[in-house]
Amino acid sequence: MVREALQFLSRLRKSSNLPDPFTCNKHIHQLINSNCGILSLKFLAYLVSRGYTPHRSSFNSVVSFVCKLGQVKFAEDIVHSMPRFGCEPDVISYNSLIDGHCRNGDIRSASLVLESLRASHGFICKPDIVSFNSLFNGFSKMKMLDEVFVYMGVMLKCCSPNVVTYSTWIDTFCKSGELQLALKSFHSMKRDALSPNVVTFTCLIDGYCKAGDLEVAVSLYKEMRRVRMSLNVVTYTALIDGFCKKGEMQRAEEMYSRMVEDRVEPNSLVYTTIIDGFFQRGDSDNAMKFLAKMLNQGMRLDITAYGVIISGLCGNGKLKEATEIVEDMEKSDLVPDMVIFTTMMNAYFKSGRMKAAVNMYHKLIERGFEPDVVALSTMIDGIAKNGQLHEAIVYFCIEKANDVMYTVLIDALCKEGDFIEVERLFSKISEAGLVPDKFMYTSWIAGLCKQGNLVDAFKLKTRMVQEGLLLDLLAYTTLIYGLASKGLMVEARQVFDEMLNSGISPDSAVFDLLIRAYEKEGNMAAASDLLLDMQRRGLVTAVSDADCSKQCGNEVNCS
């Protein structure tokens, strides 16, 4: 096709005759469809320079191509120049511009193009359903729900929605978490005598799967089968992902089997989703079984698949296998990304292999990566937990530090009892424009309680409340522990009651803490009361019921 177009251009240069519009359009389309769009642009420019007046569709083909390249400003210049060559732009010309702006994420410019058509009152041309569908698609990608509602009303004054319109609305509503609106649009579509297609169903199924409402998703899937609609790989992927996220791996496998039976070829994303699902359930064997299936299909692992497998193996305590996968990845000429490097660092630290973790960090730098906040936080946390706090501080970077990194370092310093450095870091947080959060305060309070410095711990609690931060279960438990350790049981019980009044439900740990403290001071009645309260809440205690009853002299039935 390209050769034919080039031969035509060669003959044209030797001839004084200009081509007819049909021949010109044919060759421009051939060049664009053969990925020679730049050549088609030069071809059109040559014809114009010869005084030829191209047909509008020739310009439109080139405009569409230029927009898909992302060069929408250049495409606009072409559209605006069309009248100079005796050719008026039509709605197709402007639709390409709207679509181009939306592809670039420039929704405002896309809206302005459509509004210019409306404002012309048909003098230029009227927007059609494609104009609105392109704009709605742009809104959908940017999750601009309010704009969808505005332009719904505008569109209905010009034209009626079609299947594409409804599908786009449904997709937007699902992405915005408005599932009831999505389902309502689905039913409205049917009332308008429009039949939902595979895209419509898939958008809705994906929305319900992501919301965790699998039964509605499955009912839609069954409706698709009932009307004998062919499901595609995207539909199956949405369902499989929904089952995996819920941990329903048997149903995920059944859907995979149905997919194969329907002769829909599973792609890399399907396999990666199932592999991740099994790893999340702690089932490494089945995860590796599906990895073998994936490789037997002749699929090459991409960076995402490698990341899922490495993370899954590390999370299931299979560091040796994860290391082998990283080596296999590098042999395949794929460079691990920042996430994989950080995952491996974290796994090495957790297994006590600090040297290997630090080596992985240096390897990350050697590969040209600049450590991000997650990588630096992992380093600080890992080194500090391995008892080398001062070395960890070396990796602290004020320029990159966020609340997570500050929390990690403050927690480590508090465990070491270095409260002077903690105080200094708190001042740095404010200078950096960050606000200390409850996790930072809780770590500080815990450190002070551990040292028995209850006065400063409660001062910090007051400061925390003054800054509008609510204490959580961990903060209250820490304070109760500090008071109980000092034998201040009246005060400990007051903090416990304050926690209950604030609406926080106690866990087994805080009950056990108080019960043991009461037993230690011989207040068995108070211990028994707490044990009964704990049992009423359905919590399991490490304190023996029999011991409690015995020590109470059987005054209270604790069973």
Swiss-Prot record:
PPR repeats by residue range: 20-54, 55-89, 90-120, 128-158, 162-196, 197-231, 232-266, 267-301, 302-336, 337-371, 372-396, 402-436, 437-471, 472-506, 507-541
InterPro entries the UniProt entry points to: Pentatricopeptide_rpt, TPR-like_helical_dom_sf
SUPFAM superfamilies: TPR-like (SSF48452)
Keyword field: Repeat
Gene3D superfamilies cross-referenced by the UniProt entry: Tetratricopeptide repeat domain
Source superkingdom: Eukaryota
Pfam families associated with the record: PPR_1, PPR_2
Family statement: Belongs to the PPR family. P subfamily.
Protein name: Pentatricopeptide repeat-containing protein At2g01740
Classification lineage: Eukaryota, Viridiplantae, Streptophyta, Embryophyta, Tracheophyta
